[in-house]
Amino acid sequence: MLRVRYAHERGKSHPAIHWLRGYHSFSFADYYSPQHIHFSHLRVINEDIIAPQHGFDMHPHQDMEILTYILSGTIEHQDSMGNHTQLHAGEFQIMSAGSGVHHAEINPSSEHDVHLYQIWILPKSKGIAPRYEQGCFADTEGATLILSPEAKDGAFYIHQDMSLWRWQLSLEQSAVKTIPLLPTRRYWLQLVKGQLRVNDVLLNTSDGLAITHENVLQIELIQNSEFLLFDLV
């Protein structure tokens, strides 16, 4: 079964936060939709555009796996574990809040927005030691493993029974792609950019797709596309 989460139907950040254009696939902050609380262990998928010299001041998190993916621009990260660094376009960051962590995320640019996805994943156990990783992955055609409970093939470790793959497909090399699935697992596809059909369902940039009880995804590209595919219990 396929259920589309259209980009234009997502929740939006509060208009009083003038420096933020945020779009929420699931209930978050002032946005509440009883039909969109979570999907499996996915609790938050936020697409944020943050204005120059603004961002989120130091604030707490606990018992959450937090993934950030920078699409354009730069974000400056600082946390209570002693990390103080910048993430640039194409970089990923994973942080286990665990027993408790404070962090801040600020756009240091005086000119350019930062465009990012932030994704919260419920961990399989509470109270773990906080941790932090960041890095880039190969910008190649096809699938790249980003998160894995075994941290295999260079992926970041995730404290949950799930994996995350980034798919980058071009019309020149992969106009049609078949991705086998396990019907006992649940999957979420988030289209970062492009346009494609998934089992004859049309998706545009920023659309999401909840996938259950399916054996295969038949991907037909309409434009060069990038998507995140979450493999969930």
Swiss-Prot record:
Protein name: Putative quercetin 2,3-dioxygenase PM1685
Keywords: Dioxygenase, Metal-binding, Oxidoreductase
Cofactor(s) the record lists: a divalent metal cation
Pathway(s): Flavonoid metabolism; quercetin degradation
TM segment ranges: none
Enzyme nomenclature, EC number: 1.13.11.24
Keyword match Metal-binding: yes
UniProt xrefs under SUPFAM superfamilies: RmlC-like cupins (SSF51182)
Record's catalysed reaction(s): quercetin + O2 = 2-(3,4-dihydroxybenzoyloxy)-4,6-dihydroxybenzoate + CO
Family classification: Belongs to the pirin family.
Molecular function GO labels: metal ion binding; quercetin 2,3-dioxygenase activity
Cofactor binding mode and count: Binds 1 divalent metal cation.
Biological role: Putative quercetin 2,3-dioxygenase.
Organism of provenance: Pasteurella multocida (strain Pm70)
UniProt xrefs under Pfam families: Pirin (PF02678), Pirin_C_2 (PF17954)
Chain sites annotated for binding a divalent metal cation: 59, 61, 103, 105
